């Protein structure tokens, strides 16, 4: 679907997500003005049809026709807070700001209230799709006033997998980022379940199980088929052993926020919480606890401990 080229949006933050989102919008005919403080990020988009990159924030603001629409794709916390403060001082009443980063929903509620006091509209947008979004479209969960979301609708329709599906006005300010937080918590649980299942398959070599073949087989007709499994089958077909990857899994803020939210609300979330703890353990955070456990067993039961310089059996 093509959109009115007179429609314009500013994309601020051109990393892996923001850069591809700018490309997708430009390819649908929406005029895009793009800026990032990093010159390499700007250079990567230079010359893209329908996309104008600028060198400074001042040029970025000046290039946008009023009332402006500015979409931020920045790390949560201080980078987003600082940028919103700067923009609030330079934009004019009636402009619309969209935070598409993985911000905490309470930060988004605070931003919405502060910007409204300056006459600015605000939408929080949880964005899912990763590096595949340019090709497949993005799943968008948005929060904010209905008038602001309606104004943003052509952009949401262009970014989504299809104009009618893949984006949702979830509720009031903060609702979009709350939905994205829970989405990422669910993602943690799903990924952990797949990882544990494939580890079990790998642990029984005497049965002749082929993890790559099973991953591909499970994609068709089974109750555990999913896009995550599609990706897993693809990389296992190339490298089923994965011995060049250290067994260390990073965790992002959303998994922690989801677990904390479950505690605050008294909502049982054992799978999400256990998946988060598994990531902590992979980062070496359980090493001291494991050593202490081994030493306790030796103290009360005389059980043997393994020397630190000896590899595990």
Which ranges hold each PLM region?
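NAD(P)+-binding Rossmann beta1-loop-alpha1 motif at the extreme N-terminus of oxidoreductases
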Residues: 2-69, 94, 131-133
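Rossmann-fold dinucleotide-binding core
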Residues: 9, 80-83, 104-195, 201
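Hydrophobic beta-strand scaffold residues
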Residues: 32, 53, 122-123, 269
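Rossmann-like NAD(P)-binding element
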Residues: 37, 51-110, 134-143
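Helical "substrate-binding/catalytic lid" subdomain
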Residues: 141, 151, 164-167, 174-303
